[in-house]
Amino acid sequence: MSAQPKPQLMGHIIAGYPSFESSLYAALGICQAGASYLEVQFPFSDPNADGRVIEEACNKSIAQGFKVAQGFKLLHTLSQHINQDNKQPTRLIIMTYANLIFHYGIEAFIKEAKKCGVWGIIAPDLPIESDESLRILAKKHHIRIISLIAPKVSISRIKKIAKISDEIVYVVARAGITGEKTHIDKALFEWIRLIQKHCKKPIALGFGINSYEQVAALKDKVDIIVAGSYFVRFISELSTQSQLSPQDYMHKLQAHAQMLMGWDINE
């Protein structure tokens, strides 16, 4: 399946949740739907930007023994599948917290990510002023570091983040944590316009987007829709259905992605 028109979709799964195999099938289903990007979250014990749904999934993955090496194995397998199956492969993004990268070893992490077909990295808590040379090393290995712009930051801060973020900018739709519903209203549109005034890179809007009605209202406003809890919540629901075949599992995630975006499942 080739990538769909704007707004594009950035999906999200938790590596190892509810199992290694299930997280792979979930990822493949989202990719087959036509997602242009996929965040593969490496669980971290203190995910300060995440809401209850993602935090619980991360904790379960860690309790089951998740290791960074398993995350890379998942990405390597996923990369092989999507490069084989898709004319326009989904861009794979590792989403994790800075301490996990630092603990693994920055250059070792970047090199392994590159070997596994990773396109970019999002570390929500990574300060742009003190990244321990992560951006320099990532650039050396052609890995993009995507930065976040949160509400209520200054204009100068918006400009600085927009400049340093590679290729796209992740814009946080509202204050708070992931998963809580975001109201699509005048204030949000004004926030998006403010970013666009000072940033010419494509905007990925995330936090609390979980319905087609929200996506439709944002259609001409942003370039990329980021949906995290929307997928993780659905994956949690499917985890109780042990009789699902891998093919059924992938198809359900594919349909769930297409329902959010208003894409025809037969396209």
Swiss-Prot record:
Gene3D superfamilies: Aldolase class I (3.20.20.70). It catalyses: (1S,2R)-1-C-(indol-3-yl)glycerol 3-phosphate + L-serine = D-glyceraldehyde 3-phosphate + L-tryptophan + H2O. InterPro entries: Aldolase_TIM (IPR013785), RibuloseP-bd_barrel (IPR011060), Trp_synthase_suA (IPR002028). GO terms for molecular function: tryptophan synthase activity. One of its GO terms (cellular component) is cytosol. Its EC number is 4.2.1.20. Pfam families: Trp_syntA (PF00290). Pathway: Amino-acid biosynthesis; L-tryptophan biosynthesis; L-tryptophan from chorismate: step 5/5. The active site is at 39 (proton acceptor), 50 (proton acceptor). It is an enzyme of class 4 (lyase). Keywords: Amino-acid biosynthesis, Aromatic amino acid biosynthesis, Lyase, Tryptophan biosynthesis. The alpha subunit is responsible for the aldol cleavage of indoleglycerol phosphate to indole and glyceraldehyde 3-phosphate. HAMAP family: Trp_synth_alpha. Tetramer of two alpha and two beta chains. Belongs to the TrpA family. This is Tryptophan synthase alpha chain. It comes from Helicobacter hepaticus (strain ATCC 51449 / 3B1). The gene is trpA.
